[in-house]
Amino acid sequence: RKKQFANVIITSVLEHPSVLEVMRYLETQGFILKYVNVTPNGQIDINHLEQLMTDNVGLVTCMYVNNVMGQIQPIKEIGSLLKQYPKAHFHVDGVQALGKIPMQLENVNSVSFSGHKFNGLKGQGILIIDNKEKIEPTVFGGGQEYGIRSGTVNLAMNVSLVKAMEI
């Protein structure tokens, strides 16, 4: 659906392979994939990102903290820039940041976390979205998870995830 009015995706080579492979798949589906430059200190080059931004950008995705070298990306600055482009959804991979650094998520449209990175069980994750109307369901059926992902909620896993976050 997004491809019809904003078919450009911007990411960087710093992303986790699980993100980069999805980006490459989306490119085979007709999206235009652009890579933002990285500065010598391992941060996204805000000036280059600004040059890449157009009204055709539908998604900008980046990790908050790099999983190999530990660089913290300028999420607040990126979010401020993207505010000027209402079609651009700003997703942050917060897997390495949660519980380790204070997170600034103003102007971020979605952020994802993986439970095993903060002592949760493998296979658990969290996706926080600013507006559920912006996404389509991934699994259809009973309407659980606000109609976005139907299926019986695994209460025990959810409770264990919350407990892991508290620890």
Regions found by a protein language model. Name each.
Residues R1-I167:
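Pyridoxal 5′-phosphate
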